[in-house]
Amino acid sequence: MAAADNITGDMTLADYTFPHARLRRRITSPDRTPLVLIACGSFSPITFLHLRMFAMAADYARFNTEFEVVGAYLSCVGDAYKKTGLVKAEHRVNMCSLAVAQSSWLSVDPWEALHEEYLETAKVLDHFHQEINVEMGGVETPAGRKQCKIALLAGADLIQTMSTPGVWDPKDIDYILKNFGAFIVERTGTDIDEALSTLQPYTPNIFVIQQLVQNDISSTKIRLFRRRDMSIRYLVPEPVVNYIEEHSLYDEDGAASTSSDGKGGGKGKGPGESKGATSEFPG
């Protein structure tokens, strides 16, 4: 049975403690740098592609870099982020927790989702650095304690939006890509080379992962299937399917939407940043 942190969507910030049960606290190679992958997004709902992206990134890191993955986290955007199809954070955290329940290394951190206000991606990554590298002191290695590299994990549309003028504040891009970096999974229809051409100063800290098996599942398509009363089984984890059906999520009536009219309220930008860049991750 996988270690668990008992994360539930009805937690409050007063109840919050950082989930670390599945974070590996020691690596055996003195030459490797511990890596923690962070996926920030809507996850409305989480799909098998979201989970698969973590596995692809871990393989890429093992075969192509000096990093060694010691943990990975899903961080759901909070309810202050208004978007079509976004159900309450409580539901999204619960679905993510169900999706990773049997994993030995994937975790859900509800910290971002528990905030009433919108949090920029940079603040979320700072939170992980504080908890893992400052409060916990990194991880043990044969060469002594090392800080973990905290890196963003996302689809290629993230880099595309970062290279599009007016979507992100240049200061946010600089802060994220200089201090953390990103593991980016290629997606059909995204010209990754064109997107990277405007981010040349940061390319040493951007790791592009090729999808060897093309997977086009998206949260948007899952919601569409639900509205059309079509099956979503084998596109999302079975416990998530059951949860969606039990709570009548993504039905035609738009149950549990964070938007009062069911149409969203725009992209809910934080100062200088559009969370729309990563919110569907992908979908």
Task: Describe each PLM feature range.
Residues 1-283:
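Nucleotidyltransferase catalytic core that binds NTPs
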